[in-house]
């Protein structure tokens, strides 16, 4: 059927007119032939075409008015469906306009676009009828989301189909770029959380309220809603983030049109990237991709201005060239001046050039994540815009950024062949601390922790869980537990800061598991740095300045104490350090800061860490006839900064040696990698409490340190004052370690740590008594053997706090057994096999501790498992000795 809008057929008169017109248009010059007559060439073909055009259906007939005749049977309506009876007032033009404006506003808020009335009725089918002003206004409305920009961009449904192009090429094309922008804009406008709140519209509003220039978008949310964008983002991060930033800026300006006065750029930060890469695993595969990694900041530069949008002045004619947008990899320079056509020279126009903040930091692998026997790898990270100055040396950082390369001339000179230096251009930076670990705990984890704290023997369980592979040393394990939980730091009036961390020094004979305690602490502490005194220098422990080989700028690099900020610094072979190096940590151990004044850098770094050190005595063995300070090559200023001094002696004790040997053999058999179902060895000593799993213990420590703030309220101040005065008197009388005010602060810190173990907000009397007991144990162990027994009897009421009577009686019985065994072997020779202790000797010693009833001790597991038996008829305690060892 012919098109009804086609022109009517030609008539013979029209053909004549055309011939006359062609004749008039022919050249008057006689040398040229006239135009050919197409009617003569085509013959009757034109006639046939005209006849065919006349055929077809006639739409305009004589009876067309019959379509409008009345038909009464079709004019009947159901009265129930009519609302003619109701009286509705006529709506004015203004009311209708206001109602439609309100509907459009609600539709924009819900992410729905209606066809605008102006575009629906005011447009012509012919695009030429629309003027440039109307086109511009329609485009502006589409940009701010008032109308759907359907005519300008054709939607791409299968955006993931790259049609053979690489991802970077595909997202750089106009069509996919526009589709990505539309989808991301829809995602920001319409994404709701589980509560039904608009997540990212609220984030944008909060960002603008705080005059910030970036907001965070969760990669998980993007993958759930727009999985194609989430697929493209890691593959082509430069192009995708550029689109995201532009969409975010347009959205911000649609809500706050004048926000460009605050900032000219809006950045989208990507968080929660699923895969975390180690710094040492970056390869060619990761180049120009979005990556996520962890590390510790070891060095930072200052915040420098970087050229962002450059304008140049032509030196010859003064013409201003530009703007040129500076990229990260290449430097853009004009070729010639369009005004005077000269090729230079050109100078940067300082007034009209735009700058942005730039900072370079060095990220090093976290100490706990370095494989054994490897040196830590490091990588430079570039921070731009508002990411600058968000971290300092010593911070543990989680960086999401683009792993890319830049040409480094100095690196080529060093290597002798062309290589590229790789850097990470940061997109999102998170400083990791204990708060994040606590936030990662589930409700079930918190409920388990709260239930565990209600256990009346929680302290004993925590102590038993400290280094469970080491036999005995309950005093050291209790001190380690207190150090890991720590006290509460105070800073009254921002004038005088009092540390809350507990410092611990372990000194003793070789082979007494000192280093094992440190290694265990490194594994269980939330943040720990392990070093040795032999391989540590003053700057290695504190901080040092060095000149950057490329920029020739002095930068500050952090040492072990700074890297362990808000964690634990473990120093083995503490006595092997030089005196000068050891003196450098005085400030760090008490004021918990490190002051630097070198190479024009005057600053102070935070070193809020617990110091746990291990040292060997002078000459290799601890001499009980000398004081602690005489046994250790450490000065009194450094010793007074340790809250607890633990002495480990390798003494001859047949009973303990037998139990220790059994424990070690049992441990080796139990933990052998090829062990199958074997009958287990009998435990050397039955455990009185259950251990806490190590993962749960680590969570318990972090939760307690982050959420519990113990306060000193109803404590017996006179008790502490009396103990301090008595301790000072004994100190001067014996000439041992001087007792200072620091020891009072140590008691308070240990009281707070003991309360924190129970997850209590207030320090109770029992916490203070336990802290005093720990302080006295530390002080008495540091004395000469000649005055140690006298001091134990003097402070017996403090030392016996919360000690099980069975433990006290076992300690006394062991001393009596050793004395009796030595006497028998001197009299009868080394072949003695039986040791008999009179019960009255034990009763007399027990009365000094106010212990009267010994029957529970005779029935205890501690009594039986150590090979003792009680004869009630003869009233003696018997132990059998075999081959010089106790059975």
From Swiss-Prot:
CDD domains on file: MCM2
Superkingdom as given in the UniProt entry: Eukaryota
Motif Arginine finger per UniProt: ranges: 640-643
Any one Gene Ontology molecular-function term assigned to this protein's record: helicase activity
GO BP field: cell division; chromosome condensation; DNA replication; double-strand break repair via break-induced replication; mitotic DNA replication initiation; premeiotic DNA replication
Positions that bind ADP: 515-516
Keyword field contains Hydrolase: yes
Compartments where found: Nucleus; Chromosome
EC number: 3.6.4.12
Bias (Pro residues): 1-11
Modified residue annotations for Phosphoserine: 27, 89, 92, 124
Catalytic activity: ATP + H2O = ADP + phosphate + H(+)
Job of this protein: Acts as a component of the MCM2-7 complex (MCM complex) which is the replicative helicase essential for 'once per cell cycle' DNA replication initiation and elongation in eukaryotic cells. Core component of CDC45-MCM-GINS (CMG) helicase, the molecular machine that unwinds template DNA during replication, and around which the replisome is built.
Protein name: DNA replication licensing factor Mcm2
Phylogenetic placement of the source organism: Eukaryota, Metazoa, Ecdysozoa, Arthropoda, Hexapoda
Gene: Mcm2
